[in-house]
Amino acid sequence: MIRKYRYGTPFNTEALTEKIETTEGVLPYGEVSQEEGFVFTYIMDEDDIVYGLGEANRGINKRGYCYISNCTDDPVHTEDKRSLYGAHNFIVVSGKTTFGLFFDYPSELTFDIGYTRMDTLKVSCENADLDIYVIEGENAYDIVKQFRHVIGRSYIPPKFAFGFGQSRWGYTTKEDFRAVAKGYRENHIPIDMIYMDIDYMQSFKDFTVNEENFPDFPEFVQEMDDQDIRLIPIIDAGVKVEPGYEIYEEGVKNNYFCKREDGSDFVAAVWPGDTHFPDMLNPEARKWFGDKYRFLIEQGIEGFWNDMNEPAIFYSSEGLAEARELAGKFAKDTEGKTHPWEMQDKMLSIANNPEAVSYTHLRAHETLSD
């Protein structure tokens, strides 16, 4: 059985494919406080196990640590990290009392699972605008089955995707890929896929192929396929700002990119330099960007590596300007007024700085609410 409890005015994430009516009253488990944002608290039994949160750090039992749903482009997965690439706000408390909780909330959400207090599960967020789904069943398996039913059937990859794939930055020509395939075959190591990083593109532009390095690209795709190896090209979430580039021109013309508060297209740097980001909260933009994959599908490509979509940014123009200004002050400072640690913190924070992209979320939220 699944019950929905509503707090405030939630943002419609479209996470569920089935509509569940709101249940009146209080949650059957734990307590809720809305004095400072939103806080859910549940006292755990000594033997309770907490499962869930998708691809996160540490073991299967999430008890004993603090996790933050805040998608982050961080390749260093040390145990002290609290956020990784994805955010899956679903947990199952398994013990004398077993139940599942799904927090339908699109922004930063903190799961303190026996970290601050060993017996306390605490889930908190800044704004009390969310839906909570309470899932009860015969056991943890039944709870997960019910949850998967309401979020829709998962995508089932093709058979080759369950095989081994080789991925490495720096393969720039056909010969590089042929050498990799040959090495695996000669050493009797199975291989089903070779990933193509950004070097296959023309100037790192989405939905392009470097024709100098990959002439007759469809024939090369078929050559690899004849060896039962699929080429899996990368597609980044950033579209290069370049007048005359078809994807850029179409996105600007049709307002498909994320906006700044003043209505202009948000600019930040990733691999191609200055880029715009498709507004995936806009259904028309989603369809437009998705249709562009046909460019590669029609050349024989059967799978893709979607990257940089946390979103990941190297720097924004505002962040870079602030860093340059501070660097100038630091260079001229002969009295030690600008501390070296301040300089270090500024340089380290220009990448993936949430302050640089927060207004795109706000703008999108306002647009969809109108």
Model region roles, listed by residue range:
Residues E318-R324, G328-Y359:
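N-terminal leader/propeptide and maturation segments of large enzyme subunits in energy/redox metabolism
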